């Protein structure tokens, strides 16, 4: 178990570990295959060949609201976020030089509201960066809602084969 920005996040699930056992020590860093590689490989194969459930609750979450919410996010994201209601867009956010600021998922809630999910470590930095780019968007409000929402993600290659 790893604690990251106050969130407990498992690195892997060891099949031999029992609920009442003391926590395992973090493995030694390695440039080769770590000792827990087989556990992660098994988890990967389940997600690829069947269905996996990933808890993304620790990821940063923001609400972007207002009449100009979509134009504002269109300016910051390099992918089109003006999609039908309920759709999720994967995008990067780039600065004025065209270099990377953030990787995010943007869900259109309605014409005046979007939710953005990005890496845990971006929570403080990206909020400040977005606030610094509000000029000209008077109706846009930003709200950090990380602690208000849980995100569970179903992962499966089988899902894509149905299209």
Where are these regions (language model features)?
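Glycine/proline-enriched, intrinsically flexible loops and inter-domain linkers
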Residues: 1-163
């Amino acid at each position: 178990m790893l604690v990251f920005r106050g969130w407990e996040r498992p690195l892997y699930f060891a099949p031999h570990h029992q609920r009442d056992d003391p926590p395992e020590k973090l493995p030694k860093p390695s440039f080769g295959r770590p000792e827990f590689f087989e556990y992660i490989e098994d988890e990967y194969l389940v997600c690829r060949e069947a269905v996996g459930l990933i808890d993304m609750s620790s990821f940063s979450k923001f609400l972007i609201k207002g009449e100009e919410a979509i134009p504002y996010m269109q300016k910051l994201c390099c992918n089109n976020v003006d999609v039908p209601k309920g759709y999720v867009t994967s995008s990067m956010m780039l600065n004025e030089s065209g270099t990377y600021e953030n990787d995010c998922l943007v869900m259109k809630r309605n014409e005046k509201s979007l939710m953005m999910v990005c890496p845990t470590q971006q929570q403080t930095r990206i909020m400040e960066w977005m606030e610094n780019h509000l000029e000209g968007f008077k109706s846009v409000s930003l709200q950090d809602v990380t602690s208000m929402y849980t995100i569970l993600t179903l992962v499966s290659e089988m899902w894509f084969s149905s299209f």
